[in-house]
Design a protein with these regions (language model features):
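Boundary at the C-terminal end of the N-terminal hydrophobic targeting segment
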Residues: 17-19
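Structured core elements
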Residues: 77, 93-95, 259-260, 301, ...
């Protein structure tokens, strides 16, 4: 009898713990990162699931969310009024989101389905990056549309959503892959932001998802409602002209955190031209992870071309997905994202800054620091206790050991494919030293980690720092 009672109490405790709300998020004091309400660093590791609410039933949604939680994602980006004819094509239960496509008349049955998915995500420790609408509903530059938003109904809809999800674990993402080309577009965005703030009382952060190659900073950087900048560096595979723009937003004033909310997806037609460039691979999605982080981003979003659209053989495909979403969630790139998170969390988090000075340029600079797919980037903490250099390929390079302020440097190789670290050796923290990645000449990436020996940091990627 006693054992039964103890078992019941244990199960009850587990249930209560699972139901505990996720902590609120806020911008860090230095305006570079996100932290929880008690100041703990928050690493945004997002997955792109634009059609989650629209195309999946609850059972499939739960299976998807469990898969992402197991892979240590922290944010799921999903859209209430979805891109793929989300106003007129019913969801998995046969419900449409709005009565008569009127934003002031949301369907209770449709949003009850959204509620259930948000609740399950939160129970699994996942925040929702919640897009109230896709952009074709306010700028039908392309897509199904129709345009349904005005300044007045956008504010009403925003307030309704804010009240409904005030206590949920989420981040609001306005925009939706369309440019804010006119004053009307921008005023609709501002109105929806006002409504959200009024509805949730300021409980949740707000950002804006732009179109390809653009940023929220283009139109809204100085506005109070925009808590951090989101970029869409887009579906090209080259650093130059795309991922180098993360640093541009990092350097803006006033200072705001920056995130790449849509880099190249795994198994996506590269630059939308598969006949010329083929489809992206895991290595193509790993490179932007480290490019963005080392250029100053506070986190990163991953995407898979089949998963964003939740494609199955029963659905019309968009741009030739290679496999059903149920297979795509098992692709290697998704599992490898967590290693980048682990690496960042294994060193002091809130003092990290870009550090291009840690790389010694070669005489031919298109070799190192490089260009195109083969760009070397570096980061460090502002106290000089560690530094990292991302090598996108097996090309030797020279690092400045003096970026570490201690007397001695411990060097490691960190494998972005496995998350394993291997110690190289200990050197004086002065001068320059050449390093050759473990797979010289091969198209395999590595991270060189340099630590101040006196700090006694654990192996890179270790969770020993308690995050």
């Amino acid at each position: 009898m006693r054992s039964w009672i103890l078992g019941w109490l244990f199960c009850s405790l587990v249930a209560v713990m699972q139901a505990a709300p996720l902590p609120r998020l806020k911008v860090s004091e230095n305006k570079r990162f996100l932290v929880t309400e008690d100041g703990k660093p928050f690493f945004w590791l997002g997955d792109t699931a634009w059609e989650l609410f629209h195309r999946l039933d609850r059972r499939d949604a739960e299976a998807y969310l469990k898969n992402r939680a197991e892979r240590r994602f922290t944010v799921i980006q999903a859209v209430a009024l979805a891109e793929l004819d989300g106003l007129n094509d019913p969801n998995a239960n046969g419900d449409r989101p709005l009565e008569g496509n009127d934003p002031t008349k949301p369907s209770e049955k449709y949003f009850a389905h959204v509620d259930a998915i948000v609740k399950k995500a939160n129970e699994l420790g996942l925040y929702i990056g919640f897009l109230p609408t896709w952009g074709d509903k306010w700028n039908k530059k392309w897509g199904a549309g129709p345009e349904i938003f005005t300044v007045a109904n956008a504010e009403q809809y925003g307030e309704w959503l804010g009240r409904r999800y005030k206590d949920a674990g989420l981040i609001w993402i306005l925009g939706g892959d369309r440019p804010a080309e006119t004053n009307s577009h921008r005023e609709i965005t501002r109105a929806m932001a006002r409504g959200l703030r009024r509805g949730d009382g300021g409980a949740h952060l707000i950002t804006w998802h732009p179109t390809g190659g653009a940023s929220s900073s283009q139109h809204f950087h100085g506005e109070d409602w925009l808590d951090f900048n989101m970029r869409q560096n887009g579906h090209a595979a080259e650093f130059t002209g795309r991922y180098d723009q993360t640093r541009v937003d990092y350097d803006r004033t006033p200072v705001k955190p920056v995130l790449d909310g849509e880099p190249i997806y795994e198994d996506h037609p590269v630059s939308f031209d598969a006949k010329k460039f083929g489809h992206s691979t895991a290595s193509d999605v790993r490179r932007p992870l480290y490019w963005d982080l080392f250029e100053g981003a506070f986190g990163h979003t991953y995407g898979h071309h089949s998963v964003w659209q939740m494609w199955s053989s029963a659905k019309k495909p968009v741009n030739n997905p290679l496999m059903p979403w149920t297979e795509a969630i098992l692709q290697p790139g998704a599992a490898q994202m967590q290693h980048g998170r682990a690496l960042m969390e294994s060193r002091p988090f809130l003092t990290r800054v870009p550090a291009p000075e840690g790389i010694v340029p070669e005489a031919v600079e298109t070799s190192v620091p490089g260009a195109g797919r083969y760009r070397f980037v570096a980061t460090k903490d502002s106290e000089g206790t560690y530094a990292m250099i991302y090598a996108p390929c097996g090309r030797r390079f020279t690092a400045k050991l003096g970026v570490i302020r201690g007397e001695k440097v411990r060097a490691w190789w960190f494998d972005p494919r496995t998350g394993k670290a291997t110690e190289i050796g200990v050197f004086k923290a002065e001068g320059e030293r050449m390093f050759t990645p473990p797979n010289p000449g091969e198209d395999l990436d590595w991270v060189l980690v340099l630590d101040d020996v006196a700090r006694k940091y654990p192996a890179p990627g270790s969770r020993a720092l308690g995050r």
